[in-house]
């Protein structure tokens, strides 16, 4: 007979990853993000980069360009609960922010719809991160938990298998 499994959610602190220790020391996942995103450097310190993911912001670099210095840029992912709906005014601000702050190497704006029903801004330079996040929040769109080791969009109810409609 199989023995039942009892998970242990009490991981000893000495077994935490450096990312988890960084979060615990970050004052509620805030850390130095405000200062880091306002600094003149194009990238972020490791601690801020790790925390930025929980705020829906990835630090990336142009892999088509070799050598140093790296061409740093950011990806910002909006979490769209349940995949939508998105109001006309929200689409308008997404489009306006994309036009103003995203430009790929060919000079095109870069916004993408993902297979997880999210929206991503690509090729964002550091000075554009705060205005994009702020502009989205003013219209009820948020990047919080858009990246990193967070629960992302729920595309279907976890209890849907109890639904006669779902099981039809």
Predicted regions and their residues:
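Small-residue-enriched alpha-helical segments and adjacent helix-cap loops
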Residues: 70-168
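Charged/polar, solvent-exposed surface patches and flexible loops
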Residues: 7, 31, 35, 39, ...
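Amphipathic, alpha-helical segments enriched in basic
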Residues: 4, 8, 12, 53-55, ...
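Short glycine-/aliphatic-rich beta-strand segments at the starts of folded cytosolic domains
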Residues: 27, 31-84, 152-163, 168
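Intrinsically disordered, low-structural-confidence terminal and linker regions
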Residues: 1-29
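Residue-identity detector for glutamine
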Residues: 14, 18-24, 47-49, 53, ...
